Amino acid sequence: MNFRSPSLILEPMRILRVSFLLALSGNLLWAAEPKMQPLPAPLSNNAVASLKARGGLRLYSLMGIGPKKKWDAVSNAVYALDPDTGEWTELRPVPGTAGRIAAAAAGARDHVFLFGGYVLDAQGGETTVPDVSVYDPLSDRWSRASDTPVPVDDSVIGVYQDRYIYLVSGWSNNDAVRNVQVYDGAKDKWLQATPIPGTPVFGHAGALVNDTIIYVDGAHRNPAGSQPKYVASDECWMGKIDHHDPAKIQWSKLPSHPGNARYRIAAGGSEKDQKIFFSGGTDNPYNYDGVGYDGHLSEPVAVTFAFNLRTGKWETLNDKTPNPTMDHRGLLVAPHGLVIIGGMEQGQRVTSRVTVLPRK
């Protein structure tokens, strides 16, 4: 008579139970991370912001340019994404007669603040605007704040202590500027902070985490004075904000990040991870249509990397990021991952896609 040990009988049952629990946990994880619906309309160079208010976390897309990539394709539309459901809601548009591109947005003090950008006219002319618009999500209303002293577009934005909003460098009508401008959301006043010591740039990327600003790359005038008119910058900088004076910044140069210098990378910071993340962008600067200043078509780069504030080092997260995009004003760090909204895909196609990348 063959006798099987109880442990041998129970072992298949344990395996089945573990398999069931793993499958169940996988289903629960999938259910907890809904697929993000695409933007209601394809948009690129759109400002983005996140804000956790009474209704929970919302991710915002503001203005941008549509698939035609011409002056009459610039939008003033505003959309909000609920990351828990993956659904978008169209909100009251940004006030004004024309939409803008290359604006900067940030969530602070229970509001969304929208700064600058530029408008296009039918002849291709560009005007950087000083406008500061403030959106209240509870009332779905816009108000106007004090104008930016030096109007900028294609700048880097960051928030300090949920009060001070920093605009770092950027383009101002005729050239890039070194200004670091600080908006005091509590007093509706502006401060001029320690300017950047590096080359004035536009289309650079970065973020502010705790008291630290990190920005990289962008474009600047060709120092040779020949074609192309603008070339990519490979400079990377860190700024430490003085705890007693938000207008004082100690700047220091960082080593180059992984990969080539790039333009209009999607970037965003995470206090939880103590990292500033970067993804996509292009190594061939252009204006707004994806055609490089050198006459060649620009294409997105498939590298995602981060600056680790704990170690002070660069980290490559993925050098083969699927379906990379360019022409960004930022990325948003959410519990679901790194959220990239819209942008330009390969072939300079404006997309409505919402990409969620892992944070590791």
PLM region descriptions:
Residues 17-27:
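Bacterial N-terminal signal peptides
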Residues 1-4, 11-17:
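Positively charged n-region of N-terminal signal peptides that target proteins for export
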Residues 9-11, 23:
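Low-complexity, intrinsically disordered segments with a bias for serine/threonine
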Residues 31-360:
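Kelch-like beta-propeller repeat domains
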